Design a protein with these regions (language model features):
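Acidic/His metal-coordination segments adjacent to aromatic residues that form catalytic metal sites
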Residues: 2, 40, 77-91, 122-130
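Alpha-helical bundle segments that constitute or directly flank the non-heme di-iron/ferroxidase center
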Residues: 1-26, 49-56, 60, 134-137
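Acidic/histidine-rich alpha-helical segments that form the ligand environment
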Residues: 9-20, 78-115, 135
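Conserved aromatic-histidine-acidic binding/catalytic patches
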Residues: 5, 46, 90
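Short helix-to-loop capping/linker segments positioned immediately adjacent to catalytic or ligand/cofactor-binding
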Residues: 27-32, 87-91
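Short, contiguous alpha-helical
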Residues: 30-74, 103, 111, 115-155
C-alpha cells in the first residue's frame, strides 16, 4: 500500500472502531472470548493507550536524533489501568483525537522526515514509514477483534 492509501486507512480507523462498539450492551462489551483474549471493552482501552503511545513515538522519531522508542507491557496496562471497569467513551475520544493530531503532522512531512529512524526497545530499527504501516492497520485489526468477540457472545 502506498503512503496515501496508508494515511487514508489510518484516518478511517476511529470510525471503524466506533462502529464496532456502537449499540453494544455492557454484557457484550464485557464478554471474554473463549480463546482467552480481551473483552471488547478491554480492546477499546488498549487501542486508546496504544494510540496515545504511538502519537509520542511519531513525535520522538521526528524531533529527536536516533530516538529511543519504548515498548510497554500491554497486560500490565490492562490490569493496572482498570480496563475491565472503565466506560469506553473517553477512550474512543482519545483514539480519535490522537489520530487527528498525528495525521495533521504526517500531512506536513517532507521526504527527509519519512526517512527518520530510531530504535524500538523490543523490535529494533524503527522508522516513520514503519510507524504508519503498523498504525494504519491498528484500529481496523482491533475492530475486527471486537466484531469476532461479539459474534461469539451472541452464539
Amino acid at each position: 500500500m502506498d503512503r496515501d492509501a496508508l494515511l487514508q486507512r489510518y484516518r478511517e480507523g476511529p470510525d471503524e472502531l466506533e462502529a464496532a462498539v456502537r449499540g453494544l450492551s455492557d454484557a457484550e462489551l464485557d464478554y471474554l472470548p473463549r480463546d482467552g483474549g480481551w473483552s471488547p471493552r478491554e480492546v477499546v482501552h488498549h487501542t486508546a493507550d496504544s494510540e496515545l503511545t504511538s502519537a509520542i513515538r511519531l513525535r520522538k522519531l521526528l524531533a529527536e536524533e536516533n530516538a529511543d522508542i519504548q515498548g510497554y507491557d500491554e497486560m500490565e496496562f490492562s490490569r493496572r489501568l482498570h480496563y475491565r471497569e472503565r466506560p469506553i467513551g473517553a477512550s474512543l475520544g482519545a483514539v480519535r483525537s490522537s489520530r487527528e493530531t498525528s495525521a495533521s503532522i504526517v500531512d506536513h512531512l517532507s521526504e527527509a522526515d519519512w526517512g527518520r529512524t530510531g530504535t524500538h526497545s523490543e523490535s529494533g530499527p524503527y522508522s516513520v514509514e514503519m510507524w504508519l504501516e503498523i498504525y494504519a492497520a491498528h484500529c481496523h485489526d482491533h475492530a475486527e477483534q471486537i466484531t469476532r468477540a461479539v459474534q461469539e457472545a451472541r452464539q
